[in-house]
């Protein structure tokens, strides 16, 4: 049975990525696309690379007939999603790609996002969307909150190590490089080609990046006690991709074994042989995560390197993976695309 899909916020990067992936999905059909500022336009006018697809025109959200929609992807800006989702039909399944429902604690949300949540009852209802760790909850959920792309990358590298008890929880450092599409499509001076190309810089450093809220929440939940990591992201002049270098204290072989054992049966998680390290070029445009482990010259220390595509596995691909579970479909449906190379 084909499921009818609406994409709210289809004129942004994650919205366009949803369209690209769903176009070849065997059990999903796009029946509505919203883009309030571009209402009335064809998707091919906004994204010429989608010209070959037969898609509905963009419209305003309040013009969509949700009685004909089985599931909606909400790819709207942070803070906008909570207001829009609050007004949607209560029986509608929703996957939200914003940050609005990732943190379960209203106080934590206010700490990291600077203002109270406008829909705290939905915040508590939402299921955190790191698919491989919340499958059962996602299957029965009405509202799923997509993770932050940086937060997903770091968690894939670290969660199994906390679960297996093979690292020092008080000494975890994440050094992360992110592609520019993670900053969204709106015009920003620091994202202009002349400002960004041929250089890289740290941003939201010193423990201020909002994805730290997700790390705190998830790692502390697993450990049963507060866990805080050091995290510094860097913006790099590539369109897609995230590479996280995670420095931990623990036996390198035990670290590698914990990751390999945890992801042995996972479709989209690939742990490389010990000593091999991954590259963002090998997962570009795909829903795959590659993870590598090596030892350090300092005994008892290990380096874990994880890579994923921020627009796919870090956002839209993850969202479709979660939607597949919510709709009772094959979890990997529409997502087995090979990476784009070179």
Curated annotation (Swiss-Prot):
SMART domains: Semialdhyde_dh (SM00859). Pathway: Amino-acid biosynthesis; L-arginine biosynthesis; N(2)-acetyl-L-ornithine from L-glutamate: step 3/4. It catalyses: N-acetyl-L-glutamate 5-semialdehyde + phosphate + NADP(+) = N-acetyl-L-glutamyl 5-phosphate + NADPH + H(+). GO terms for cellular component: cytoplasm. Its EC number is 1.2.1.38. InterPro entries: AGPR_type-1, NAD(P)-bd_dom_sf, NAGSA_dehydrogenase, Semialdehyde_DH_NAD-bd. It is found in: Cytoplasm. GO terms for biological process: L-arginine biosynthetic process. One of its GO terms (molecular function) is NAD binding. Keywords: Amino-acid biosynthesis, Arginine biosynthesis, Cytoplasm, NADP, Oxidoreductase. It holds the Pfam family Semialdhyde_dhC_1. Catalyzes the NADPH-dependent reduction of N-acetyl-5-glutamyl phosphate to yield N-acetyl-L-glutamate 5-semialdehyde. HAMAP family: ArgC_type1. Belongs to the NAGSA dehydrogenase family. Type 1 subfamily. This is N-acetyl-gamma-glutamyl-phosphate reductase. The lineage of its organism: Bacteria, Pseudomonadati, Pseudomonadota, Alphaproteobacteria, Rhodobacterales. The gene is argC.
